């Protein structure tokens, strides 16, 4: 295996940042994956005098561990960490060499204070944009705490192991041999699940904000930055930074960037927010909003935050089909991310529910991996762009069924089929398959606001041209609102609008002394 010249050039620059020696212990067999893995580690060693290679026997073959001379860190890559995981490999080399990780000090302290033995195993696919966050978080924990170890396992290289554990979604994480979690997680979320997260009482003691942003997606980040630039006390509370774009692989319509990926854009947003004096409160969900002298936001952990104005940017989530079997077989054949989970269905039959752009794009993606794709569309015609439909219709292993109402997703311990009704004849049909990808759009994250402010029949928050809701001092932005179009760049613009609207509200509704301070 030879790295492409461009990648090798970039890698060479990163390897120059290594601060100490690194020993790669390699466990290889006679198979093609082992051969490619050996080529990769040998190439790494040829590029830096700080990297040496030693053959050994590890729990899995092919695999290699990343260590300091005389000290095992517990970091193991089972398979070849290329694709989206190449960054995970580079970071592991740098951090094991002694380069300080880019993590907040309180997070580092929490990791170091964990007591006990924790062995994590993360099952990933190299095409999964959600997996590197988990892999890099667990590697970081392994570097900082000798009681923690982590093995990344490429599902494509260890198919028998993946199938024996019925893993049908990535990333899936095991802890000490037992299922721990699945899906994207930050290091803060992992720490919280281990019971090592921040104390919720710290939030309740915070002074009131001038502007409190609820939600950390593009709209929320834009709102917080625009508010902070006005010199007013700004906070942002969010479950996770990045919002829905964290589940988006390819972004080609973000003006000024010909191409980027959701996780990269989310990281840039968070980095930009941290350039300002903004109180960022992650891993928190809002539970209740109440307008008093100040606006109160109660969090699910019981803490109450207070602010003179609030900007709601809670975004949207995948819409569920709402049929029997969907929840029962989630991550057991029911999936929402074709980029992440598609490789786990290689050579199998799957269905895609939804004939819009996202559904057709998913079907096109999956057609190159699986045996056959069936697209089920509720309406008489597909809603996807014509260019996508033309591409879809050119694929030999795709069947499109229109006027199809999904009735049930069937299975035993995992999905084995789907039933749908022909809306013309009302006849029910059943298709045997291994996976179902749900792609029927989004639903706004506004359930917690029921009865609090005006929402339309879709659950979207109704706002005016300034981003204001019908509750004085409460503004909203992004995909949770009645904005006509749901696009990243539009969400950012609406976030800026809401922040400026909130600032104008503060000027007109505070005492002269407070207004002068705000300026």
Swiss-Prot record:
EC assignment: the record states: 7.1.1.2
Provide the protein's localization: Cell membrane
Annotated Pfam families = Pyr_redox_2, Thioredoxin_3
For FAD, which residues are the binding ones?
210-241, 469-479
Query: Molecular function terms in GO for this entry?
Result: flavin adenine dinucleotide binding; NAD binding; NADH dehydrogenase (ubiquinone) activity; NADH-dependent peroxiredoxin activity; oxidoreductase activity, acting on a sulfur group of donors, NAD(P) as acceptor
State what this protein does. Transfer of electrons from NADH to the respiratory chain. The immediate electron acceptor for the enzyme is believed to be ubiquinone.
Query: Required co-factor?
Result: FAD
* Summary of subunit composition and partner proteins: Homodimer.
Per the UniProt entry, what is one GO biological process?
response to reactive oxygen species
Cellular component (GO) terms are: plasma membrane
Explain how, and how many, cofactor molecules are bound: Binds 1 FAD per subunit.
Membrane topology note:
Peripheral membrane protein
Query: Where primarily located?
Result: membrane
- The protein depicted here goes by the name NADH dehydrogenase
Q: What is the lineage of its organism?
A: Bacteria, Bacillati, Bacillota, Bacilli, Bacillales
Annotated PANTHER family:
THIOREDOXIN REDUCTASE 1-RELATED-RELATED (PTHR48105)
């Amino acid at each position: 295996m030879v790295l492409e010249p461009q990648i090798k050039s970039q890698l060479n620059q990163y390897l120059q940042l290594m601060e100490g020696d690194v020993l790669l212990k390699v466990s290889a067999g006679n198979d093609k994956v082992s051969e490619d893995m050996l080529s990769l580690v040998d190439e790494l060693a040829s590029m830096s005098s700080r990297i040496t290679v030693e053959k050994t026997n590890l729990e899995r073959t092919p695999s290699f561990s990343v260590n300091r001379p005389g000290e095992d860190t517990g970091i193991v890559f089972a398979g070849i960490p290329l694709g989206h995981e190449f960054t995970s490999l580079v970071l592991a080399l740098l951090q094991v060499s002694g380069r300080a990780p880019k993590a907040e000090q309180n997070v580092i302290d929490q990791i170091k204070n964990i007591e006990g033995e924790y062995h994590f195993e993360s099952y990933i696919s190299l095409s999964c944009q959600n997996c590197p966050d988990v892999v890099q978080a667990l590697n970081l924990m392994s570097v900082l705490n000798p009681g923690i170890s982590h093995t990344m396992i490429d599902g494509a290289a260890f198919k028998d192991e993946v199938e024996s554990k019925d893993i049908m979604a990535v990333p899936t994480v095991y802890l000490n041999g037992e299922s721990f979690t699945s899906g994207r997680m930050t290091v803060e979320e992992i720490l919280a699940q281990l019971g090592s997260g921040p104390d919720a009482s710290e939030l309740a003691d915070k002074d009131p904000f001038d502007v409190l942003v609820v939600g950390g997606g593009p709209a929320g980040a834009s709102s917080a930055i625009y508010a902070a630039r006005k010199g007013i006390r700004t906070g942002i509370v969010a479950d996770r930074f990045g919002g829905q774009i964290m589940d988006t692989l390819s972004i080609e319509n973000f003006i000024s960037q010909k191409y980027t990926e959701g996780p990269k854009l989310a990281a840039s947003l968070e980095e930009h927010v941290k350039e300002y004096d903004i109180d960022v409160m992650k891993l928190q969900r809002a539970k209740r909003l109440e307008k008093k002298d100040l606006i109160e936001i109660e969090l699910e952990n019981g803490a109450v935050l207070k602010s003179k104005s609030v900007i709601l940017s809670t975004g949207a989530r995948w819409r569920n089909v709402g049929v029997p079997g969907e929840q029962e077989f989630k991550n057991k054949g029911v999936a929402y991310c074709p980029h992440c989970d598609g490789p786990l269905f290689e050579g199998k039959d799957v269905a895609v529910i939804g004939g819009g752009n996202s559904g057709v794009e998913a079907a096109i993606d999956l057609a190159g991996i699986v045996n056959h794709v069936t697209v089920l569309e509720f309406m008489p015609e597909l809603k996807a762009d014509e260019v996508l439909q033309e591409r879809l219709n050119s694929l030999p292993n795709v069947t499109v069924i229109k006027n199809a109402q999904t009735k049930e997703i069937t299975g035993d311990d995992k999905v084995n089929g789907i039933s749908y009704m022909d809306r013309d004849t009302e006849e029910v049909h059943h298709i045997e398959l291994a996976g179902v990808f749900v792609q029927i759009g989004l639903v706004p994250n506004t359930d917690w606001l029921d009865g609090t402010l005006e929402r339309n029949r879709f659950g979207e928050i109704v706002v005016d041209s300034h981003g204001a809701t019908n509750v004085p001092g409460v503004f909203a932005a992004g995909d949770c609102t009645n904005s006509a179009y749901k696009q990243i760049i539009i969400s950012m613009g609406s976030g800026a609008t809401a922040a400026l609207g909130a600032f104008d509200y503060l000027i007109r509704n505070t005492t002269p002394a407070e207004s002068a301070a705000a300026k």
